[in-house]
Amino acid sequence: MGSRCALALAVLSALLCQVWSSGVFELKLQEFVNKKGLLGNRNCCRGGAGPPPCACRTFFRVCLKHYQASVSPEPPCTYGSAVTPVLGVDSFSLPDGGGADSAFSNPIRFPFGFTWPGTFSLIIEALHTDSPDDLATENPERLISRLATQRHLTVGEEWSQDLHSSGRTDLKYSYRFVCDEHYYGEGCSVFCRPRDDAFGHFTCGERGEKVCNPGWKGPYCTEPICLPGCDEQHGFCDKPGECKCRVGWQGRYCDECIRYPGCLHGTCQQPWQCNCQEGWGGLFCNQDLNYCTHHKPCKNGATCTNTGQGSYTCSCRPGYTGATCELGIDECDPSPCKNGGSCTDLENSYSCTCPPGFYGKICELSAMTCADGPCFNGGRCSDSPDGGYSCRCPVGYSGFNCEKKIDYCSSSPCSNGAKCVDLGDAYLCRCQAGFSGRHCDDNVDDCASSPCANGGTCRDGVNDFSCTCPPGYTGRNCSAPVSRCEHAPCHNGATCHERGHRYVCECARGYGGPNCQFLLPELPPGPAVVDLTEKLEGQGGPFPWVAVCAGVILVLMLLLGCAAVVVCVRLRLQKHRPPADPCRGETETMNNLANCQREKDISVSIIGATQIKNTNKKADFHGDHSADKNGFKARYPAVDYNLVQDLKGDDTAVRDAHSKRDTKCQPQGSSGEEKGTPTTLRGGEASERKRPDSGCSTSKDTKYQSVYVISEEKDECVIATEV
């Protein structure tokens, strides 16, 4: 379980390291020369046009950005930018580290948080300032010189030197890109940090590869290397140098099986076997069968054969002889080596050590010299002081005599199916379509030419690309617009027509709008009516707002005319009505009272909203001084009070009620001539002149009450109506 967790963490660490790469671009300003002390516009740095001396207080603006075929000095500086303080006047040199001015560090460092692309564009501007505190770079009049270049740069510790000359100025500088600690590879994208713990036991190579510590192996160096010779199947180890045996095996290397218990003269190929040795038999191999097996008389690996009881023969191996093969044969006995060569006896063979000047199996050949021209294919021959010679082979050949041609393609250096061509002293990879580079290991960016049109997103493949189109476009390159009528934008049975990059709806009769979503009013036929459908079909232009507005205005005019006719008819009917009592003739009432009645000292009192509650229960309004308590008295004893608004001017009961009301509600002191004429009382007088016996009572809430209560004179029920 622990090893699995360690492996998972190591894999996660490797994935994260592939995403977060780290390195730094370093630019070292070494020397700047302004020969005449002039600005780029040939003016004196102090602003005048006169002759020198002109002292140019020089500072630099550095802009590092991505590779551009035509370098633009304008921002943004995608990789970083820096502005130095004033570093000198006219011509000066810059030491490493920036010198005494702590505000400037030389070299200038631009850290990278992503893989180094290998190319960059660099802009270095030398500018003049009158004050060390004014380091603005936007004024072109301050420019002394400008360097704008693009370069290819590989990762490494070595500095790339460069010199920029612009006629009057020279700038000497150097640059490099180095990886941060624990980062390796061509783009500083390989992360490797040495460790020696439960998660790995390794160091890092030059390219960031993991180099396992002694005794460890595996992708993350988490697997211990067991004791050399330890059987891989039958042994294991928890730490380097161990060899622990599995069940059924034994020995230092766990390569010996454990025999069946009780086996005496037997062996095993698998645990718990008992395979009898020659000359022995039985279940436990404890029964003697022959002499050869028991006594092993034959020596030096000879084969013993039982020829009878107690007898045997030995079959000797080459190089041995004797009854039991105990004697070795001396192959050097006939002295096979010639020309003074020394012989060495071997098993069933011999070898000759030749003196200087001779060679061959038995030293029978004399050595050649450079005079014999032994070197082939243009090799250069050199005589050895002890005799013989040596050949120095040209490029593309090897061997003692330069007789072998080197095949540079034998190691298969080309990747991705590329064909290797041997050029004699080098090789060339012919890449398949979609790949480039020396070894054809770079996938060509098919999206570099921006093949996707109309804002489509390009995804690179192998010799191919794909486009993710924005809404409204389709096709391999997003160049084909989606049919505008595809989603049926026209409503109410309209017909959709495509007109370039838009659509036009041919509306059915009676509908209008860009999508025929409006129902048009039916207008009388005439020359002023415009057929919107024909207009849309003929012109294919925008929505005919003029025609729609004209139709709406015409309908409004018709409605206004009808309203005017109704008003005139009502006015004419009112003129022909006979004169009537103002109160009887007024049909509009509020709180069940005519406007004129609300200002009289009326015989009906309105109870305020806070004094009465709408209910269908009977209430006693006839106690002692009930009229005074409740503040109201019946006005129309014999009239249906729900029909107050329907009373006519010629109703006799209404006239009697009015006369009775006038009699009862007249204030004291009024003359008989004023009988039947409504009298208006002020709010204060009404409250002061209230009489208990009068049966009339006024209320301050008379005019603006939402509930009007009418009581029968001899009935306990209360009728309430709400206006």
Curated annotation (Swiss-Prot):
Sequence positions bearing Phosphoserine: S694, S697
Post-translational modification remark: Ubiquitinated by MIB (MIB1 or MIB2), leading to its endocytosis and subsequent degradation. Ubiquitinated; promotes recycling back to the plasma membrane and confers a strong affinity for NOTCH1. Multi-ubiquitination of Lys-613 by MIB1 promotes both cis and trans-interaction with NOTCH1, as well as activation of Notch signaling. Ubiquitinated by NEURL1B. Phosphorylated in a membrane association-dependent manner. Phosphorylation at Ser-697 requires the presence of Ser-694, whereas phosphorylation at Ser-694 occurs independently of the other site. Phosphorylation is required for full ligand activity in vitro and affects surface presentation, ectodomain shedding, and endocytosis.
Region annotation (Interaction with MAGI1) ranges: 720-723
Positions of region (Disordered): 653-702
Cysteine pairings via disulfide bonds: C179-C188, C192-C204, C212-C221, C226-C237, C230-C243, C245-C254, C257-C268, C263-C274, C276-C285, C292-C304, C298-C314, C316-C325, C332-C343, C337-C352, C354-C363, C370-C381, C375-C391, C393-C402, C409-C420, C414-C429, C431-C440, C447-C458, C452-C467, C469-C478, C485-C496, C490-C505, C507-C516
Compartment(s) of residence: Apical cell membrane; Cell junction, Adherens junction; Membrane raft
GO cellular component: adherens junction; apical plasma membrane; cytoplasmic vesicle; extracellular region; membrane raft; plasma membrane
Tissue specificity as recorded in UniProt: Expressed in heart and pancreas, with lower expression in brain and muscle and almost no expression in placenta, lung, liver and kidney.
InterPro entries: DSL (IPR001774), EGF-like_Ca-bd_dom (IPR001881), EGF-like_dom (IPR000742), EGF-type_Asp/Asn_hydroxyl_site (IPR000152), EGF_Ca-bd_CS (IPR018097), Growth_fac_rcpt_cys_sf (IPR009030), Notch_Cell-Fate_Det (IPR051022), Notch_ligand_N (IPR011651)
Gene3D superfamilies reported for this sequence: 2.10.25.140, 2.60.40.3510, Laminin
Extracellular topological segments: 18-545
Cross-link Glycyl lysine isopeptide (Lys-Gly) (interchain with G-Cter in ubiquitin): where in chain: K613
Molecular-function GO term, any one: calcium ion binding
Membrane topology classification: Single-pass type I membrane protein
CDD domains for this protein: EGF_CA (cd00054)
Job description of the protein: Transmembrane ligand protein of NOTCH1, NOTCH2 and NOTCH3 receptors that binds the extracellular domain (ECD) of Notch receptor in a cis and trans fashion manner. Following transinteraction, ligand cells produce mechanical force that depends of a clathrin-mediated endocytosis, requiring ligand ubiquitination, EPN1 interaction, and actin polymerisation; these events promote Notch receptor extracellular domain (NECD) transendocytosis and triggers Notch signaling through induction of cleavage, hyperphosphorylation, and nuclear accumulation of the intracellular domain of Notch receptors (NICD).
Disease: Neurodevelopmental disorder with non-specific brain abnormalities and with or without seizures: An autosomal dominant disorder characterized by developmental delay, intellectual disability, seizures, autism spectrum disorder, behavioral abnormalities, and variable non-specific brain malformations.
Subunit (UniProt): Homodimer. Interacts with TJP1. Interacts with MAGI1 (via PDZ domain); forms a complex with CTNNB1 and CDH2 and promotes recruitment to the adherens junction and stabilization on the cell surface. Interacts with PSEN1; undergoes a presenilin-dependent gamma-secretase cleavage that releases a Dll1-intracellular form. Interacts with MFAP5. Interacts with MIB1. Interacts with NEURL1B; leads to ubiquitination. Interacts with NEURL1. Interacts with SYNJ2BP; enhances DLL1 protein stability, and promotes Notch signaling in endothelial cells. Interacts with MAGI1, MAGI2, MAGI3 and MPDZ.
Stated name of the protein: Delta-like protein 1
Organism: Homo sapiens (Human)
Gene: DLL1
